[in-house]
Amino acid sequence: MPGNNTGYAKGVYGIGVRQDLFPGETEFFRKNPHVAGMAAEDNRIIMNPYSGLTDAEKQAVMLNEAARVHMRVGNFDTPRFTLTPEQEKAFAGYSTNPTDRLSTVAARILSNDPSALTPTPEQIEYVQRLRKFMGVK
């Protein structure tokens, strides 16, 4: 599992994984099998037991969600880069909070998720710093 060789004591890159889902989370995941996992409100990573991801895909999702928690709780600076017009359009419905949109784009770039679309040099620089902070190779 990622995180075991980064200097963090537990979890995925220092963020805990919660196996037991709360009732609302279970229902959400059951209705949304396309949502692979999330950074839960308790700042733990939760995975969707109804998604059909491979182990490698699950690892990428956990990396993505760990990065989002680090940004959310202030362990790493909040992204302040600009989204491209294509990213603005693609993530317009993701959240009403602009920081959530920036954080998800950064985390998706970090985990090599193509849904982040084409990153700008500013986004790449931010993600390189995030990668170094998290100890991601």
Enumerate the predicted regions with their spans.
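A general structural signal for short secondary-structure junctions and capping/turn motifs
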Residues: 5-7, 37-38, 94-95
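Active-site scaffold of zinc-dependent metalloenzymes
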Residues: 13-59, 66-72
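Metalloprotease/metallohydrolase-associated module, dominated by Zn2+-dependent proteases
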Residues: 17, 29-33, 56, 79-137
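Zn2+-dependent metallopeptidase catalytic core
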Residues: 1-14
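General N-terminal targeting signals
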Residues: 63-64, 79
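Active-site-flanking alpha-helical
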Residues: 67-75, 84, 111
